[in-house]
Amino acid sequence: MSNRKYFGTDGIRGRVGDAPITPDFVLKLGWAAGKVLARHGSRKVIIGKDTRISGYMLESALEAGLAAAGLSALFTGPMPTPAVAYLTRTFRAEAGIVISASHNPFYDNGIKFFSIEGTKLPDEVEEAIEAELEKEISCVDSAELGKASRIVDAAGRYIEFCKGTFPNELSLNGLKIVVDCANGATYHIAPNVLRELGARVVTIGSEPDGLNINEKCGATDVRLLQERVVAEKADLGIAFDGDGDRVIMVDHEGNKVDGDQILYIIAREGLRQGQLRGGAVGTLMSNMGLEVALKQLGIPFARAKVGDRYVLEKMQEKGWRIGAENSGHVILLDKTTTGDGIVAALQVLTAIARNHMSLHDLCSGMKLFPQILVNVRFTPGSGDPLEHDTVKAVTEEVEQALGKRGRVLLRKSGTEPLIRVMVEGENEAQVTEFAHRIADAVKAV
């Protein structure tokens, strides 16, 4: 990726009220995007958001900017990110825009774009938008200004799409499922999808108030879900993040089932049904246990850089159809164009219903290696801690100690000023000690 001023790995993101997530910048962003997108002929853009209170302000700013450039906005209201990608395709809109900071706290927000195909915008389009941002804002003639309207049946359209990815001959009758919607964008979607397919549904994290998105709930914190699954004697639990593009599951014993295990289940089921094309894509963070388990099944495995856009790029490069991050981004190109938590969960539920097996049993063919992740905050602009000699030396020592039976990965977060230190190996105590040793070295520089 080229060096850009505003667009990161997942659009533009930051704290609301601080540059660039301010009303004036977002208005200009809408205008700049409108100027670039108008060159392609279409005059309509889908705008969706999660449940953050700042979404109202930011969608109004985007609408004003787009209208000034001559594009009309179609609002979905609170809607999962993958739903916006789907609606962008079905409405033949020139682009889709999602106002969300995904799994971040409510005081953050962000803007990301989808192309007419429902995929992330190509780099060159993002670069063209950045170039327009450097210009003075202008307005088209009054007769050419854009309009705004709402898609009144957006939720219903997406619910039917999700249900369509679950086999007609199967149902979820007899399954009791606890669903944690992270007080986010899936709150009015996921429970209805599961109920309409026959499940008994218990909901948590489904009362958004604009401030409680991702707060001690959802895919980034499944402790409450684990407790409720056990207390309710449910068959399983499903947790989404604030914008619905991630999913983490919990088995009937309260054990967490992450994106690596979900990818394993979906890949194995695809192999059993003769529907798996090629192999599966993970990331540098994917557990070694996934690689070992897939190898035992004869399924090729490739690692991409961390970030769903890189998983997708690797899938396209290989011509493969399934990929995932252990954080719960699961991309299934036979079903949709981007990471979709609900669709991914439905494919796991397909394996449960078809094989009459529990989620716990479906995971049993894959043994996770102990993997310790430590996040270390650093001050932006203070130099790169990863390039410091002390950090390099400690990392090398750990790598030599682990040999071929473990891995070390240090990387910067694409969305926050964090260094992520990951150490993986067969001995949990050793791996934990190594991870904190490296993290301490990073903190000290």
Curated annotation (Swiss-Prot):
Catalytic residues identified in the record: 102 (phosphoserine intermediate)
Modified residues (Phosphoserine): 102
InterPro entries for this protein: A-D-PHexomutase_a/b/a-I (IPR005844), A-D-PHexomutase_a/b/a-I/II/III (IPR016055), A-D-PHexomutase_a/b/a-II (IPR005845), A-D-PHexomutase_a/b/a-III (IPR005846), A-D-PHexomutase_C (IPR005843), A-D-PHexomutase_C_sf (IPR036900), A-D-PHexomutase_CS (IPR016066), Alpha-D-phosphohexomutase_SF (IPR005841)
Principal EC category: isomerase
Swiss-Prot/TrEMBL cofactor(s): Mg(2+)
Recorded family membership: Belongs to the phosphohexose mutase family.
Name of the protein this chain belongs to: Phosphoglucosamine mutase
Organism listed in the record: Cronobacter sakazakii (strain ATCC BAA-894) (Enterobacter sakazakii)
Upper taxonomic lineage: Bacteria, Pseudomonadati, Pseudomonadota, Gammaproteobacteria, Enterobacterales
